[in-house]
Amino acid sequence: MYLNGRITRIFRLKKNSFRQQNFLYPLLLQEYIYSLAHYNSFNSLISYEPVEIIGYDNKSSLVLVKRLITRMYQQKSLISSLNDSNQNEFWGHKNSFSSHFSSQMVSEGFGVILEIPFLSRLVSSLEEKRIPKYQNLRSIHSIFPFLEDKLSHLNYVSDLLIPHPIHLEILVQILQCWIKDVPSLHLLRLFFHEYHNLNSLITSKKAIDVFSKRKKRFFWFLHNSYVYECEYLFLFLRKQSSYLRSISSGVFLERTQFYGKIEYLIIRCCNSFQKILWVLKDTFIHYVRYQGKAILASERTLILMNGWKFHLVNFWQSYFHFWVQPYRIHINQLPNYSFSFLGYFSSVRKNPLVVRNQMLENSFLINTLNNKLDTIVPAISLIGSLSKAQFCTVLGHLISKPIWTDLSDSAIRDRFCRICRNLCRYHTGSSKKQVLDRIKYILRLSCARTLARKHKSTVRTFMRRLGSGFLKEFFLEEEQSPSLIFLQKISFILHGLHRERIWYLDIIRINDLVDHS
């Protein structure tokens, strides 16, 4: 901890010296950058597999960083790395240190460096506007109470997929308005060409492997930068089409080249731009997004929703200069449609409600319908995620986890229990709990099979020896875990009992096994 605090203080001092001119390339040759990147990457890691910690000297040598950048700029080394990956000494997999260092530490360090101009503007913006720092505002579950309050009164919903693939040069141009450092941009282009599959890594719904052990800081930075550009077009139209002040857009950073692009578009369609804004004027529209998928909902008519779709597609095509497939935006009526978002199938259901009306001495009953947001867990998708992680088959049949048999019994139980608690805790907002009981059963028996395989015994014999209290922590109530929660009673009747929908407001990262979309 002392070493990390010292590195952080040095990093802040260096960052202030480079903040004015945004000249970031010399930071690549600073040794503490890679130590800081390694420390942050390790601490933010949520993994179910054992993590191999490599020493500081093996990953943060300044001489190796210089040699690495020099080799990257050598044309022969670049060509050989692209043509013959088996004989490549730099990017190849035969040299474990080179592959780990080049693909992990340099990209992580480069991501830390690229965040400097963004972080300085964000901190100054928050200080000027005096925005309070509430940790629960970062919760993923905080989206669902918002949807419960808003979607029940709306008519149409649009499923949006962020446009992809995108040309690599467009990513460089996106960052060019923030970073004026030409050597850093050249090095960024070189990184893009080395990661030849970057298109599928940063924008598609399979952006990062669901069960990957490490999520690259560098790729998250590129993903967020690109999504920011896509959303800024929407926020610009939303702000121009409504005279109401948008609170959500207050935290966005100031742009330098975006308005020049908009002026160019206004000149091209100056006669029809005001008509477009008049068509898009809608003060009752709501927008939420997670990763590459977004939800756009409104209480207006289908014509207005088609107008939003048409103009968003055209603005994306004009701004990014590539074809945006219109089929990526689906418009549906909320009462007749279920959409997948953040690991749930959500839909608006008609809930019958009987109200007793009292007028003087007479009373009578009124039957009415009330809209309720119904969120359920997709059993097939969740079991498919468990099968990819090799906890069961695609059909839900139990299997053991042979790669964990070298661990101790307590370590195996802790891993299974942690996965089970995380999944059940995240899905406590479901109106149907039968799927969660099935997930508990699969993980409990998979743990028993793994332990029985380790001790070379049968599952029945092993569980009989341990007794009925085996793995009772699998069935602990989710309400016992200490956290900030949001309770809401729902009218769904399951097995004759009223169930509570629970949203946890301290979940700031979606679990790997939850992100099965």
Curated annotation (Swiss-Prot):
Under the cellular component aspect of Gene Ontology, which terms does the record hold?
A: chloroplast
Q: Which classification does the entry list for the species?
A: Eukaryota, Viridiplantae, Streptophyta, Embryophyta, Tracheophyta
Q: Which UniProt keywords apply?
A: Chloroplast, mRNA processing, Plastid, RNA-binding, tRNA processing
Q: Provide the leader sequence positions.
A: none
Protein family:
Belongs to the intron maturase 2 family. MatK subfamily.
Q: List the HAMAP family hit by this protein, alphabetically.
A: MatK (MF_01390)
GO MF terms here are:
RNA binding
Location, primary (coarse class)? plastid
What's the name of the protein? Maturase K
Record-linked Pfam families: Intron_maturas2, MatK_N
Q: Which GO terms describe its biological process?
A: mRNA processing; RNA splicing; tRNA processing
Question: Any idea what job this protein has?
Answer: Usually encoded in the trnK tRNA gene intron. Probably assists in splicing its own and other chloroplast group II introns.
> Subcellular location, in the record's words?
Plastid, Chloroplast
InterPro entries per UniProt? Domain_X (IPR024937), Maturase_MatK (IPR002866), Maturase_MatK_N (IPR024942)
